[in-house]
Amino acid sequence: LLMHVAFNGEIILSAPSWVSYEPQAIIGRNKVHWIQTSRENNWFPSAKQLEKKIKSIKKKNLIFILNSPNNPSGTVCKNLKELALVAKKYNLLILSDEIYTDLTFCNKYDSISKFYPDGTIISGGLSKWCGAGGWRVGFFAVPDKLSSFLESIKTLASESYSTVNSPTQYAAVEAYEGDHAEYKAKTTNILRS
């Protein structure tokens, strides 16, 4: 939600997508533009669809929210490089919601930031892969080029909440620094079932 308030532009979303993206954008006074997807492209827009949508929008301060692995479909975006090329061409900002990165059916994951590092903001957290829903431990990884955007988010955040409680912070350190190969293997096995 803070990202939407800090961003003064319009949002491109693919359908289907997480149910709260649109309401959060509306609260942040961001107009939403939808791209309808299909099973043929794994429930993600094609590069052609993204380019067509960008061209159809008059305002050019845009952000595309990419959620891969996707909620609700669980699929992984397979055309990241092509989407990144379009994004670069139009200087499109991408918010890559990677909250499900460690919970994939195929156990393989790439981030669009690999192909478009200067224009991609990555968001992630513990709630999904670590079973820590409600802890509200998350992060934004922002490229240096977008440091002013990060400052806006930090300013808003400091007025919205002060910090995550100490026990949760210690648990987060263990979650991110510990070796969880066995846990992830068991989780992947459950997903395959």
Please place each PLM-identified region on the residue numbering.
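Short beta->alpha connector loops at strand-helix junctions that form conserved
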Residues: 15, 34-39
